[in-house]
Amino acid sequence: MKIKLRLNKSTIESVKADLIEKHIEISEDANLILTEENYAGDSMECRNETGVVFVNTESICYMESIGHDVYVNTNDKRYKTRYRIYQLERLLPSERFIRISNSVIIKKNSIRHIKPALSCKFYLTLTNGSVVDVTRTYYYKFKEFYGI
């Protein structure tokens, strides 16, 4: 059995030792991922036209789901990831990322402008120039976080 680890630096060595002792192989190309609850990873596995790349989470502006595909958008590039939006919501640290609709997660400090709209919505202009909307489902959570 192969497992990919997504653990904080404080616990990774002890978990690795336990898994190796139990004859479990640790590999980056494994289908199973063991993720710590408060894992604050610094990079995310994505794909572009040349292959697999690791995108630094600090450079991410927002992530969006379009159909069955999930895209990671930085200020200047767009990557595809195999993670689903609900997985990214759990994987990424909630101190830096917030879900604003069923299909979009933004980095909290990537907002350039907030424009209120009718019927419990906001339109956000992000640092890369994209405009995304906070839907009614996530409206109050967004307002509470930013103190609006």
What is the role of each PLM region?
Residues L32-T127, V131-D133:
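Conserved binding/recognition cores within well-folded domains
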Residues L5-N8, V132-T135:
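Active-site-adjacent beta-strand anchor residues
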Residues K2, R6, E13-S43:
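Short, well-ordered secondary-structure micro-motifs within conserved domains or adaptor modules
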Residues T137, K141-I148:
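Charged phosphate-binding loop/patch that engages nucleotide di/tri-phosphates or the phosphate backbone
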